[in-house]
Amino acid sequence: MANPSKSPDPVRLKIAVQKSGRLTDSSLDLLSRCGLKYSRGKDQLMCYGENMPLDVLFVRDDDIPDLVQEDVCDLGLVGLNVVQEKRLAFAARGIAPLFETVQLLDFGRCKLCIAVPDGFEYGGAQSLQGKRIATTYPNILGRFLADRGIAAEVVVLSGSVEIAPRLGRADLICDLVSTGSTLAANHLRHAETVLDSQAVLIRTPVPIAPEKQEWTRRLLMRIDGVEQVKGSKYIMLHAPRSALPAIAKLLPGSEAPTVIPLEGRGDRVAVHAVCRENVFWETLEELKGVGATSVLVLPVEKMLA
């Protein structure tokens, strides 16, 4: 059982995740799929791994790059939008953004977009000239405008950006968009994409203590193994040996399949393959059409290359 009063151990890995928000559940699911077991009480901001020397800190997402930059945490799971905003903020203050982006992760996808009111006539980025644009990402927006030679006023808000035009605080907004439903509810529409974002794994710039290095390597390997197989399927089937060339062409995104002779059937084989693309019903029907039988499709939970 986790002990919330326990003091941090300097030889235990510390990983920062968003306390509450769109990345929280997916971040914790990723760690669980990597084998981490922990207990978390209500409002508990630090959890201790029960089967790994790894502790999870629950913090505001925009604090995660700072904690990793300052070596308070060894690793962080955070949105690329936050990482890019912090890099530019550090650079503006003359601070080298030393934390390293280790891996792009397959969740938390969204776009940082310019959105305009429904009645606004948008004719390209030059339509932003002289406008007031509300955002919580002033550095990313500022760079976007500067790169295009656009002079506009950046209005910095900490939240509820979508309502700024209706309140007269801004003409347009620059905010994260996932489905677009919030924009529509506030009579806004997408005009320009500033940044494509997703969750990323970042790492401290400070050399990790020897006691932590092995578990860091193992955790990164496990994360890679979990991410590799998202959407992958394991296919098993029986087929005539003569049908192997046709079957190999039909298996989506697979390496060379494993072919196993069937006992007492010299003309038939079992075929096993990991497919890294979606396997649709049409694929199964085509496999059956070239002679495959007993076709079985299984999800792949994890894989080490």
Report residues per predicted region.
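Short, structured active-site "lid" loops
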Residues: P53-L75
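Small-molecule-sensing regulatory modules
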Residues: A2-L54, V78-D106, K111, F120-A305
